[in-house]
């Protein structure tokens, strides 16, 4: 009862803390009118992107606000008129903050399947619903904060958004993904550079032919130059023009984070020239990039401005010596590391260097492709970063090991070296009950907020449920749990899910969390909107 009398300003801060936990927010709306009025906007600012299992009937609640003509069109497509609510308590469409057009379309398709109406799935139905919802958001003067445009999901509502420039005029986070050259895309990029100058986070990925790169680069450069408060940017391609646009730009005193994503640095020689003009640069992130050779590393090392290398994700190592030099200079700042390297000699050298120079890693993702005789290097690395480690993933999906010895050694030795608390642990291993029991017994001192297990065992009849029930459910050692087989089929029945819920443990569908996602876990500024 005392909690229901919290001051409104304090209540707002409390609810903001739980904005990613929809179950808690749902509980809050039941407390009293004040709590309800404060929690509802948070629940409805981004309903299409809930990472947890969601009730797709929220789409029907949106449809209540459509005008009669639009409702008639949907009924003509076969929609049951009884699906429209008789009334609603709020103008829910006015609360939308984050617009991901692909996720809207996907949610509509999933909702359509749940209705299972034979005449319902006509080809243009999803497009019609999507366009109707966007029109609804515009009409209700939604104050849009984030926009994600994905190639193929945008054409049908492109003109609708351009005709209502105020709708996206104040966006702070812009994500342009998988774009290809077209008249509409160039028109949209021009529109953004002229009408949206308050973007703080920009993610830009395009896949276009070489002859179109200059036009796409020009479009991105104009957007960058027009910004007044750009703080974070992700480059994929084209790099040269867009990177050069940072020189003498408005963002020289605002840009603090640069992410290089799948970039080939082979002919890039302007890093020093550009970075030395960025006065508040704090960190760079190198994600699956190529040609991290001596020429690249020397450019990075010779930059005069102080900054930190926060992330390094590798899928190949062409030259180890430059990489070792990079780790010597920046390893003490490294927080996110992933290895997909399949060359055994280079991988062994890499693990030794990371263990030696990097002691502050928070998220560690390992795709191990080599034999168990060197597994102590993995254990040494985990032990070395134990105090800072929050996210850990170990994937042995592609290890050829007929007896599963490598998998067993991991399970039998991992539990005792884990920190006292982990936000996330993902294990993709061939698992048997005895090895899992050893792991769970040894990790009893560790609370794991989200435990994700994918059993790669070829024995489809192996049963680990009693072990899970004994050491996880009854001891309440996790908050979220997902277990699946190698075909991503969940092992839990509806009865199991309800039983775990009694112990305050939520069963999720298997969804592998990439290390790249961890960079933005709980941060709506970029990927996880």
Regions found by a protein language model. Name each.
Residues 19, 23, 40, 44, ...:
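Short amphipathic alpha-helices and their capping/turn residues within compact interaction modules
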């Amino acid at each position: 009862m005392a909690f229901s009398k919290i001051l409104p300003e304090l209540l707002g801060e409390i609810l903001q803390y739980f904005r990613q936990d929809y179950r808690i927010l749902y509980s809050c709306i039941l407390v009293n009118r004040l709590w309800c009025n404060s929690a509802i906007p948070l629940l409805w600012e981004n309903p299409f992107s809930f990472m947890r299992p969601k009730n797709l009937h929220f789409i029907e609640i949106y449809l209540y606000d459509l005008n009669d003509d639009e409702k008639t069109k949907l009924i003509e497509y076969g929609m049951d008129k009884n699906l429209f609510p008789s009334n609603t308590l709020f103008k829910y469409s006015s609360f939308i903050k984050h617009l991901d057009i692909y996720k809207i379309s996907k949610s509509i398709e999933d909702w359509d399947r749940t209705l299972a109406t034979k005449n319902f799935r006509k080809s243009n139905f999803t497009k019609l619903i999507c366009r109707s919802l966007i029109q609804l958001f515009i009409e209700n003067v939604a104050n849009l904060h984030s926009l994600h445009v994905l190639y193929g999901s945008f054409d049908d509502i492109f003109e609708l958004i351009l005709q209502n420039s105020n709708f996206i005029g104040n966006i702070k986070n812009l994500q342009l993904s998988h774009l290809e050259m077209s008249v509409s895309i160039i028109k949209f990029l021009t529109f953004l550079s002229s009408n949206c100058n308050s973007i703080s986070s920009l993610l830009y990925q395009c896949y276009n032919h070489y002859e179109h790169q200059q036009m796409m680069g020009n479009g991105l450069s104009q957007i960058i130059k027009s910004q007044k408060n750009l703080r974070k940017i992700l480059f994929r391609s084209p790099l040269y023009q867009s990177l050069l646009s940072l020189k003498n730009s408005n963002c020289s005193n605002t840009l603090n984070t640069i992410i290089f994503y799948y970039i080939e640095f082979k002919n890039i020689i302007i890093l020093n020239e550009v970075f030395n003009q960025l006065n508040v640069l704090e960190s760079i992130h190198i994600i699956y990039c190529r040609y991290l050779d001596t020429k690249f590393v020397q450019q990075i090392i010779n930059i005069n401005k102080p900054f930190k290398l926060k992330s390094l994700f590798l899928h190949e190592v062409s030259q180890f010596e430059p990489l070792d030099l990079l780790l010597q200079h920046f390893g003490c700042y490294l927080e996110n590391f992933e290895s997909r390297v399949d060359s055994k000699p280079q991988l062994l050298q890499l693990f030794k260097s990371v263990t030696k120079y990097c002691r502050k890693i928070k998220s560690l993702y390992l795709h191990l492709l080599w034999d168990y005789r060197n597994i102590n290097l993995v254990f040494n690395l985990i032990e070395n970063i134990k105090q800072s480690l929050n996210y850990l993933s170990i994937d042995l999906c592609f290890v050829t090991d007929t007896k599963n010895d490598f998998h067993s050694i991991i399970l039998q030795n991992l539990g005792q070296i884990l920190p006292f608390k982990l936000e996330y642990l993902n294990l993709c291993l061939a698992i048997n009950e005895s090895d899992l029991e050893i792991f769970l017994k040894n990790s009893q001192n560790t609370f794991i907020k989200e435990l994700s297990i994918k059993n790669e065992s070829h024995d489809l009849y192996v049963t680990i449920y009693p072990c899970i029930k004994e050491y996880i459910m009854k001891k309440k050692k996790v908050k979220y749990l997902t277990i699946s087989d190698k075909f991503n089929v969940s092992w839990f029945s509806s009865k199991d899910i309800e039983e775990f819920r009694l112990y305050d443990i939520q069963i999720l569908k298997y969804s592998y969390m990439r290390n790249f996602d961890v960079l933005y876990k709980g941060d709506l500024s970029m990927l996880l909107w």
